[in-house]
Amino acid sequence: MPTHRGLRHLALRVTDLARSRAFYERFLAMKVVWEPDPDNVYFSSGSDNLALHQIAPAELAQYQPLRGQLLDHVGVIMENPAQVDDLFRDVQQDGARYGATIAKPPKQHRDGSYSFYFADPDGNVIQALYEPTISR
């Protein structure tokens, strides 16, 4: 059986590309690496890649029933709990301007990890996570 070398990217359909672009630049510090046309933008953090694709208004109805049901969340790893708290404060203070909402406040988990959840303008949930065994 062929093996893969890892996940290349995550692609999300969005309803307002400009608003979503601002969200991912502001809160996840993603950098645009390619913008082939007005309906698509590709980001990288240096090691992780994200693609955003504008949903055409005529196609929106076919995606609405699925929204929030297929993707549970995307996790981003943070170096330490203080960074989780810093990002939480940033989203609390500046999130509304970028269409961000807090989904779950910071919490210490049983496995020693620490995280909070927030949603992008289209309701895609992101977990900002400190995980002791891999955050080092």
Report residues per predicted region.
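Conserved active-site tyrosine of GNAT-family acetyltransferases
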Residues: S20-E25, G123
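Short beta->alpha transition motifs characteristic of CBS
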Residues: H109-R110, L129-S135
